[in-house]
Amino acid sequence: MKQLESFEIPRTVIFGPGAISKIHQIVASQKASKILIITGRSVTLQYAKTIADMLTDRSVEVLRYDYIDIEKSGFDLVLGVGGGRPIDMAKVYSYVHKKPLVIVPTSASHDGIASPYVSYTLAQKMIKYGKIMASPIAIVADTSIILNAPSRLLKAGVGDLLGKIIAVRDWKLAHRLKGEEYSEYASHLSLTSYRIVVANAARIKNFVREEDVRVLVKALIGCGVAMGIAGSSRPCSGSEHLFAHAIEIRLEESGGDAIHGELVALGTIIMAYLHGINWRRVKKIAKLVGLPTTLREAGIDYDLAIEALVVAHTLRPDRYTILGDGLSKDAARRAIEATELA
């Protein structure tokens, strides 16, 4: 007999042009009087202030994610307004203080807009609090706002979605070889998100219409739900993400930066090759959308990419993938050269 299962997924999802106007309604449903809005810099900060102006009947504090004191209490509800970093920090605060979370994405560059989990690098920094897991009670995705995000970030959202084909294959592999628990339902949701964006890639690639953003947001939210059902990021994060994380860690140490979804797209091409599936098709879709399809286009040094492939498997030793016990440097070079990334 199987054990009991439980999972948390967003209770309310509101998306479309003007969705931001519904925030007061969501806040009222929570009977929250003291609200913390965690946001980013410049444009996202302005959106956060706009939301604060909608909540003048409440006590609202707006803070940038890099100014947050995680230990400070006294709020009834947390709003994460912005891109990846503000949203992730809002999840951390929500988890630590056990307060409800509302996510208001101003871009759609990755599936964190609906997932309970934070980025690998932030999770490591916040390890003293345990495994961060904060499923939002509501997601308010105003597509008229997201449409104004830099197109490079929206294309990165497609890159993150391309990785789902690898994540699910890695999960199946771990299930077959290591007996890891596997959810057909969560996998199906993740792959459906992948298929939606691939089927519409040619139509949405320039992100000039509201419906283009709508397709992307729906797919990303689907991935967030998949992770909630699985109880982990497994259906949406495999070896392609380990490669991306390995690069992100090295860049952070050296003061560099990269766009997550672009790295995931490159990782997906490499891992498709290792899995023996059609990596050329993945690369073709990435190119069609306007994602980097070489290391040079992504601004990634060749030696850094080799190092990332060699060490990627060590980042999550509990997560078996096609990388197995790791690639040798020669195998890493062959993979990069075979996929014409260099």
Swiss-Prot record:
Which keywords appear in this protein's UniProt record, sorted alphabetically?
Cytoplasm, Lipid biosynthesis, Lipid metabolism, Metal-binding, NAD, NADP, Oxidoreductase, Phospholipid biosynthesis, Phospholipid metabolism, Zinc
Q: What is its EC number?
A: 1.1.1.261
Q: Does the keyword Repressor apply?
A: no
Q: Which Pfam families match?
A: Fe-ADH_2 (PF13685)
Binding, Zn(2+): D160, H241, H260
Q: Tell me a Gene Ontology molecular-function term this record carries.
A: metal ion binding
Q: Name the InterPro entries for this protein.
A: G1P_dehydrogenase_arc, G1PDH, Glycerol_DH
* Entry keyword annotation includes NADP: yes
Cofactor(s) for this protein? Zn(2+)
List GO terms (cellular component aspect): cytoplasm
Q: Which residues bind substrate?
A: D111, D160, H245
Q: Give the reactions, separated by semicolons, that this protein catalyses.
A: sn-glycerol 1-phosphate + NAD(+) = dihydroxyacetone phosphate + NADH + H(+); sn-glycerol 1-phosphate + NADP(+) = dihydroxyacetone phosphate + NADPH + H(+)
Kindly tell me the pathway this chain contributes to.
Membrane lipid metabolism; glycerophospholipid metabolism
Q: Where in the cell is it found?
A: Cytoplasm
What biological-process terms (Gene Ontology) are attached?
A: glycerophospholipid metabolic process; phospholipid biosynthetic process
The cofactor binding remark recorded in the entry reads: Binds 1 zinc ion per subunit.
Write out the residues that bind NAD(+).
Answer: G84, R85, P86, I87, D88, T106, S107, A108, S109, S115
According to the UniProt record, what class of enzyme is this? oxidoreductase
Instruction: Write out the similarity annotation.
Output: Belongs to the glycerol-1-phosphate dehydrogenase family.
Q: How does it assemble?
A: Homodimer.
Q: What does this protein do?
A: Catalyzes the NAD(P)H-dependent reduction of dihydroxyacetonephosphate (DHAP or glycerone phosphate) to glycerol 1-phosphate (G1P). The G1P thus generated is used as the glycerophosphate backbone of phospholipids in the cellular membranes of Archaea.
The protein in question is named Glycerol-1-phosphate dehydrogenase [NAD(P)+]
Source organism of the structure: Pyrobaculum islandicum (strain DSM 4184 / JCM 9189 / GEO3)
Organism phylogeny: Archaea, Thermoproteota, Thermoprotei, Thermoproteales, Thermoproteaceae
